[in-house]
């Protein structure tokens, strides 16, 4: 199922961890799919239009998968409101951040690092107020 011009649902439900643990990571409600489509249209597609292809490393997570990867108990990934974006380099990540901060719809924008690996967590709420939180986290 196509969520926007360049993003399909399978990019957001694909998970090596789910496959390894035998967890079926599929959206369980229309709301989750609508939330992912909103995230794509308002945040990810504009980023892709500006910079070319981007890689989603984590999108939708059903609760069992979210627990298995150590996600927060109230993670927006479980509602289809969030995605983690692979960063090919720190410089490219800084370009992504600068652009994402200019978008009119943004709930959270988090620069995350675990050792030498960095990624950006981005979220947008289709319903409710977007907080425009900017943070960084070192795991």
Residue locations for each model-derived region?
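Extended, low-complexity, intrinsically disordered C-terminal regulatory tails
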Residues: 41-70
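Amphipathic alpha-helical interface surfaces
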Residues: 32, 36-43, 65, 81, ...
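Short connector loops at helix/strand junctions that flank enzyme active sites
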Residues: 51, 78-82
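Extracytoplasmic cell-surface/polysaccharide-interacting catalytic and binding patches
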Residues: 1-48, 136-139
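N-terminal start-of-chain detector that recognizes signal peptides
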Residues: 27-28, 54-60, 91-96
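Catalytic cores and adjacent binding grooves of peptidoglycan-active enzymes
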Residues: 74, 79, 87-139
């Amino acid at each position: 199922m196509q969520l926007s011009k360049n993003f399909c649902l399978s990019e957001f439900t694909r998970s090596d961890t789910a496959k390894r643990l035998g967890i079926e990571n599929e959206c369980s409600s229309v709301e989750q799919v609508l939330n992912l489509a909103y995230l794509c249209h308002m945040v990810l597609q504009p980023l892709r239009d500006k910079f070319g292809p981007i890689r989603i490393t984590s999108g939708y997570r059903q609760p069992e998968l979210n627990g298995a990867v150590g996600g927060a108990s109230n993670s927006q990934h479980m509602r289809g409101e969030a995605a983690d974006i692979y960063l090919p380099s720190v410089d490219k990540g800084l370009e992504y951040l600068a652009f994402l901060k200019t978008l009119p719809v943004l709930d959270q924008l988090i620069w995350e690092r675990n050792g030498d690996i960095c990624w950006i967590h981005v979220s947008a709420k289709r319903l409710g107020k977007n907080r425009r939180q900017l943070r960084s986290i070192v795991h």
